[in-house]
Amino acid sequence: MSDASSTILFEYPLNEKTRTWLRIESLSQQLHQNHSLTDMGSALTFFRAIAELLDVLERGDVRTELLKELERQQQKLLQWSDVPGVDMERIHSLRRQLKDLSSTLMAAPRMGQFLREDRLIGMVRQRLGIPGGCCSFDLPTLHSWLHQPKELREQLVFSWLNSLSPLKQALDMILELIRHSGTFRPQTSLNGFFQDNASDADLLRLRLEQMHQLYPQISGHKTRYAIRFLPLDSENGHIPPRLTFELACC
């Protein structure tokens, strides 16, 4: 997020696996942004992100889906080998990275298991569902731990984040390749509505000028999608008859 940018980027997943991956990416970013745990607020944000990440990981076989996607991306890169003028050194480098990530992910323990077995995480996770349930009288262990020397806390936090490294590295690579597979092109909505074919895409990326004070409401799946633009101010906002925006189908 940046106030300096004149455009806003929106992303919408077109299948369940991409939806899960974007949620994991978002939670991973929250963990790394709040890992310093300088106060109770940042600590609760950090532990809440861990709890939500574990919930997401427990809903499906994330590792299997990532391994399938790493293999699929390798095959896609292999197809580029037949294109005249393609940078073969770059292709080989990316394929090696994908193979290494696949091997590391396959050898890693169960996703999130190290975090599930941690006593402090378990206690905090149990109390997060209770409104205000992480007060010092509810969780004296957390209150005491936050007053431990910074070096000791950082050492433990590093071990938590490091346990997620195989997951994060594989996911970062996959999402980067998916995002770069689509090119932004100018599109125009009529009376706030736009629809098109998705062509088995995984992800929609939409750039919109901030000055319009609009946001997109997107629905769709791997074959077709629809976008409706709505005003931030639902009472006094205006939707132009023709609105230009940029869209990438990835």
Curated annotation (Swiss-Prot):
The gene is zapD. Cell division factor that enhances FtsZ-ring assembly. Directly interacts with FtsZ and promotes bundling of FtsZ protofilaments, with a reduction in FtsZ GTPase activity. Its main location: cytoplasm. Belongs to the ZapD family. One of its GO terms (biological process) is division septum assembly. It holds the Pfam family ZapD. Transmembrane segments: none annotated. HAMAP family: ZapD. One of its GO terms (cellular component) is cytoplasm. NCBIfam families: PRK05287.1-1 (NF003653), PRK05287.1-3 (NF003655). SUPFAM superfamilies: YacF-like. Keywords: Cell cycle, Cell division, Cytoplasm, Septation. This is Cell division protein ZapD. It comes from Pectobacterium atrosepticum (strain SCRI 1043 / ATCC BAA-672) (Erwinia carotovora subsp. atroseptica). Interacts with FtsZ. It is found in: Cytoplasm.
